[in-house]
Amino acid sequence: MRKIRTKICGITTPEDAAAAAAAGADAVGLVFFQGSSRAVDIARAKKITAALPPFVSVVALFVNESAQNIRRILAEVPIHIIQFHGDEDDAFCRQFHRPYIKAIRVQTASDIRNAATRFPDAQALLFDAYHPSEYGGTGNRFDWTLLAEYSGKPWVLAGGLTPENVGEAVRITGAESVDVSGGVEASKGKKDAAKVAAFIATANRLSR
């Protein structure tokens, strides 16, 4: 049986984390990028992770952050996986000795085709919509048909997903992992528990 794994990104409160876990999320994402409306600091991150049950993975999202700050956060917050969303290269990403996901902002098929070669040590790649000045969480989607024949390194689909379109997205791309942030929000940084539950329920129905 194939299970569609779900990550709810941009969690900012313990209550939203607990609701995501209760709905069946496999992972939650904490944004440590101060340029984001969904950013959290170490103190807030500790409260969020304390609200989670066992076996829900915590993913820390960084954008062009210094190695020193990343190490400080990893030392204080229980992080399972790092997600790099900026211009980091493989050598930078692998130095923390933690499984990492590299976000790829997709414009053309070559972005997808070359990603595994550029990031050989990544546990997975996350394919997101390209934006010239923003690093994820834009609500934009890219051409999902570009992924229809992809069979490389494990990957995650992101970019403009919602409870209403995640089914179509999975059918077109064959994604086995999906990541959502803005598509399940009531407002910037605040999740809508009903939308979170609907998103995860749809993904679960697609599992086989």
Curated annotation (Swiss-Prot):
Gene3D superfamilies: Aldolase class I. It is an enzyme of class 5 (isomerase). Its EC number is 5.3.1.24. Pathway: Amino-acid biosynthesis; L-tryptophan biosynthesis; L-tryptophan from chorismate: step 3/5. InterPro entries: Aldolase_TIM, PRAI_dom, RibuloseP-bd_barrel, TrpF_fam. GO terms for biological process: L-tryptophan biosynthetic process. Belongs to the TrpF family. Keywords: Amino-acid biosynthesis, Aromatic amino acid biosynthesis, Isomerase, Tryptophan biosynthesis. Coiled coil: none annotated. It catalyses: N-(5-phospho-beta-D-ribosyl)anthranilate = 1-(2-carboxyphenylamino)-1-deoxy-D-ribulose 5-phosphate. The lineage of its organism: Bacteria, Pseudomonadati, Pseudomonadota, Betaproteobacteria, Neisseriales. This is N-(5'-phosphoribosyl)anthranilate isomerase. One of its GO terms (molecular function) is phosphoribosylanthranilate isomerase activity.
